[in-house]
Amino acid sequence: WPMEYLGNYIRPDRIEKDDIILFPHRDAPEKQLNIFKELEKELPQYKWINCNDYNLTKKEYNQLLEQSKMVFSANLQETLGISCYEILMAGGMPLVPNRLSYVEMYEDIFKYPSKCTLDWKGYQDHKTILIGKIETMMNNFNAPEIQDAIKSNRQSLLEQYFTATNLYQELQ
């Protein structure tokens, strides 16, 4: 099972992380890259990286995850969200809308109101909420509440979604 090997390649123990926010999703309309780019203008104190702008090897991508504090999602379509799990594996945090598979997979601390990114108008109408959430999470990254949530969410996803243990047991 491919996800079970991530722990061999992504390390969560990098002590100092940089103020980097990643967009590791493909460039597709339902991923709303335009919102990410607009947030970059609104919050220039952070380094915003669209991973598609670079020809990263898997090793380079994993190192970037380990260096970064956040993966941002404004997705309108998602079934699993591997990159949001990868940032947890790297000791960082996802920031996801409270919709789609994110509702059941991610702890509330990592969610923002869905209305903030339902569409461009929703973003324009509610961007102060989203900007405030990003600033709060980035500024308090080392707070016990966030660090504990990273660890517990990583463990729950590993046990519930990113393991083939139940499949192996069924096959025996």
Q: What positions do the PLM features span?
A:
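Short alpha-helical segment that forms part of, or immediately flanks, the ligand-binding pocket
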Residues: 62, 85-89, 100-104
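Short hydrophobic beta-strand element within catalytic cores of glycosyltransferases
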Residues: 93-96
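Conserved catalytic-core segment of nucleotide-activated headgroup transferases in glycan assembly
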Residues: 3-58
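Short alpha-helical donor nucleotide-sugar binding micro-motif in glycosyltransferases
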Residues: 62-68
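A charged, aromatic-enriched C-terminal amphipathic alpha-helix characteristic of glycosyltransferases
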Residues: 117-172
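Aromatic "clamp/platform" in nucleotide-sugar-dependent glycosyltransferases that forms part
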Residues: 75-76
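Short acidic/histidine- and often glycine-rich active-site loop of Leloir-type glycosyltransferases
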Residues: 98-114
